[in-house]
Regions:
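N-proximal low-complexity "stem/linker" segments adjacent to membrane-targeting elements
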Residues: 1-24
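Cell-envelope/extracellular polymer assembly enzymes that use nucleotide-activated donors
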Residues: 4-6, 34, 181
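C-terminal catalytic/acceptor-binding lobe
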Residues: 17-21, 168-247
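Short, acidic, metal-binding catalytic loop of nucleotide-sugar glycosyltransferases
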Residues: 23-33
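Glycine-rich, basic loop-to-helix element that forms the pyrophosphate-binding segment
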Residues: 68-83
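Conserved catalytic core of nucleotide-sugar-dependent glycosyltransferases
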Residues: 81, 99-170
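Short aromatic/hydrophobic "clamp" motif used to bind/position activated sugar donors
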Residues: 89
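The conserved acidic donor/metal-binding loop of glycosyltransferases
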Residues: 93-97
Length: 247
């Protein structure tokens, strides 16, 4: 029986990648049941034609669109995960272009290991400062086997019923740290966090085949110095019971 996967994409400032991202999602070896696009009102500086690209693109007729005239930020995609039709959910950042076997890769582990899967994995070296192991797991570290971590980002693959745990407690911020919050909430329910294999010689399994896009100038983590927010969210979740692997 084919897994029923709902995909949630975000449209905001990267219209140049959306068409390829949709193509790559639709070409998965385990095809998605549905693809939803959350359209956050982009900044006016983006320009009319680029904003239009976020709604009119190849295969747009195969994508369900939620169009907002306001930028609600990064939280809604996790909120809407409970309302989709699939048994599994995969949320993508708008800079993430998966290999064609990414869903297949995640499905090997999500139930067997009871784990949230992501394409970049971090293990913290401090419970008060945003210091992590280098390299990160995933397309950066190119791990040959599954690696359990504290935090995953860029793509999140999980069982739909786990989405409700995001709201066990309110996240500290609505503009940053949703990935940290979700991982911390899942831990309360015995759900681990992992980065599936990203072998050097098989990019079809990777969660993103163009990882450098995640550090461009419009990336939330790079658009300004977020170290203070990162520090605050980390300390908040640790104070509320989040246990870090190496500490």
């Amino acid at each position: 029986m084919t897994a029923k996967i709902s995909v949630i994409l975000t449209a905001w400032q990267r219209p140049q990648y959306l068409e390829e991202q949709v193509d790559r999602v639709l070409r998965q070896t385990v095809p998605p049941h549905e693809v939803l696009l959350w359209y956050n009102q982009p900044p006016s500086a983006l320009g009319f034609f680029k904003r239009k690209q976020l709604l009119e693109f190849r295969n747009a007729d195969r994508v369900k669109k939620i169009v907002c005239d306001y930028n609600f930020g990064i939280i809604p995609r996790f909120a809407m995960a409970s309302a989709v039709e699939g048994d599994y959910v995969c949320i993508f950042d708008d800079d993430t272009l998966p290999g064609e076997r990414w869903f297949e890769n995640c499905l090997r582990f999500v139930d067997q290991e009871k784990t949230l899967c992501g394409t970049i994995g971090l293990r913290f070296l401090s419970d008060s400062e945003p210091k992590t192991e280098v390299p990160r797991m995933g397309w950066a570290g190119r791990n040959e086997k599954i690696e359990f971590v504290d935090l995953v980002g860029h793509s999140w693959f999980f069982r739909r019923e786990w989405a409700r745990y995001f709201w066990d407690t309110e996240p500290l911020l609505r503009s940053f740290g949703e990935d940290i919050h979700f991982c911390a909430m899942l831990q309360r329910h015995g759900i681990r966090v992992a980065c599936p294999p990203h072998p050097q010689d098989d990019t079809s399994l990777w969660g993103s085949v163009k990882g450098d896009l995640g550090v461009d100038k419009v990336a939330i983590s790079c658009s300004k110095d977020r170290s203070q927010e990162f520090r605050e969210v980390l300390q908040y979740e640790v104070a509320n019971g989040w246990r870090l692997m190496l500490l």
